């Protein structure tokens, strides 16, 4: 049977439990038509690049599906009807990716970075409250006197 990766976005105001129920419902449709879900990943509530149907965020869910084409057409039909689903995308793949998807690996990498703790000296490092513009910078000399715009160019050159 063909292999598919299916991602759908659920509305931001849907609870995690509602998204889980929606995933269970879609999985039931797939299994009812002779397919099977080999992997389910919930990527959580993430920001959208642009507003979709007045939503700025959405719950992202990935399903790896092994089943006939009729399964895909039926779950897409069900998702068009369901008001909680903002967008969906199904892609046929040659083989499913083993282990966590790229999005989950990225989330793990971000969590590892957060484990490093705060930087020494806070955000500003060793600048001790000196911003870019505070106090005398000492890297510039005094300003040159302004030349009058009214004076002719020959008089300025002397």
From Swiss-Prot:
GO MF term set: small ribosomal subunit rRNA binding; structural constituent of ribosome
Region (Disordered): 92-158
Gene Ontology annotations of biological process type: translation
The keyword Ribonucleoprotein appears for this protein: yes
Transmembrane segments: none
Pfam family, one: Ribosomal_S6
Gene3D superfamilies: 3.30.70.60
Composition-biased stretches (Basic and acidic residues): 92-149
Keywords: Ribonucleoprotein, Ribosomal protein, RNA-binding, rRNA-binding
InterPro entries according to UniProt: Ribosomal_bS6 (IPR000529), Ribosomal_bS6_sf (IPR035980), Ribosomal_S6_plastid/chlpt (IPR020814), Transl_elong_EF1B/ribsomal_bS6 (IPR014717)
A GO CC annotation given for this chain: cytosolic small ribosomal subunit
Matching PANTHER family: MITOCHONDRIAL 28S RIBOSOMAL PROTEIN S6, SMALL RIBOSOMAL SUBUNIT PROTEIN BS6M
Note from the entry: The initiator methionine may be removed.
Function: Binds together with bS18 to 16S ribosomal RNA.
Protein family: Belongs to the bacterial ribosomal protein bS6 family.
Protein name (database record): Small ribosomal subunit protein bS6
Provenance organism: Rhodopseudomonas palustris (strain ATCC BAA-98 / CGA009)
């Amino acid at each position: 049977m063909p292999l598919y990766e299916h991602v759908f976005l659920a509305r931001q105001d849907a609870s995690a439990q509602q998204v889980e129920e929606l995933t269970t419902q879609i999985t039931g449709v797939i299994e009812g038509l002779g397919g099977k879900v080999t992997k389910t990943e919930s990527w959580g509530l993430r920001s959208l690049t642009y507003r979709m149907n007045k939503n700025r965020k959405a719950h992202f869910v990935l399903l790896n599906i092994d089943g006939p084409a009729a399964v895909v057409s039926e779950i897409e039909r069900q998702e068009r009807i369901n008001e909680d689903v903002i967008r969906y995308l199904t892609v046929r793949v040659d083989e499913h990716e083993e282990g966590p998807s790229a999005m989950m690996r990225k989330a793990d990498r971000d969590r590892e970075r957060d484990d490093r703790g705060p930087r020494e000296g806070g955000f500003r490092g060793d600048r001790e409250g000196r911003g870019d513009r505070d106090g005398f910078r000492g890297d510039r000399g005094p300003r040159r006197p302004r030349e009058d715009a009214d004076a002719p160019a020959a008089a300025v050159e002397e």
